[in-house]
A protein has these predicted regions:
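ATP-dependent adenylation/nucleotidyltransferase module used to activate substrates
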Residues: 2-187
Length: 187
């Protein structure tokens, strides 16, 4: 196997320390191409109030006669916490909060979840991932030395959220994410 020549992107600081990075003929990396082609065209920091209001109205209409309008995945981090706050305080939605105990939760995240639930006056459903199965999966990832060691945990969180939604008839799921600080490379 030949060693790759060191190269830095002509547009950012990414380099060949990322073994999967690809450069075009001008030296721009695929991370930058992904940003300019997929993220930037859909990234609107100012928001689109009309579209947001249409979505809120649809969620409320679909939730008529039900205890909850939507399901919100809450990690206790900034993004999902802000979504929960907006859903209740700004948009007047009636969410059920969905939190996952992955066996690796930080104490601060768990405390944040409790504070948010209490302050917003919302119900919560806790899903506990099987500890032994999670440890076996993560040990297999460590031993195989694959990148993205968080894959078992991340996939379990979203699988639990979407399975719960499907089993319980939730039509709308709100999650928090941030294109500006997450997912430089999608797994």
């Amino acid at each position: 196997m030949s060693k790759r020549e060191y190269q830095v992107c002509s547009n950012c600081v990414m380099d060949t320390s990322d073994s999967k990075i690809v450069f075009d003929e001008k030296g721009m990396c695929d991370h930058c191409h992904n940003f300019y082609e997929n993220i930037k065209p859909n990234w609107n920091p100012e928001g689109n109030p009309e579209e947001l209001q249409k979505l809120i109205d649809k969620i409320k209409k679909d939730g008529q006669g039900k205890k909850y309008d939507c399901l919100i995945g809450l990690s206790g981090g900034v993004d999902s916490s802000y979504v929960a706050y907006c859903a209740v305080k700004k948009w007047g939605l009636r969410p059920l909060i969905f939190a996952v105990d992955t066996c690796w939760n930080l104490e601060v995240a768990d405390k944040n979840i409790e504070k948010i639930i209490k302050k917003l006056g919302v119900d919560v459903h806790y899903e506990k991932i099987n500890h032994d199965e999670m440890m076996d999966l993560q040990l297999a990832f460590f031993k195989s030395q694959v990148p993205y060691q968080d894959t078992p945990q991340d996939h379990n969180i979203f699988a639990a959220l979407y399975n719960f939604a499907a089993k319980n008839g939730f039509k709308h799921i709100l999650t928090g994410g941030n294109y500006s600080t997450e997912c430089v490379r999608e797994p």
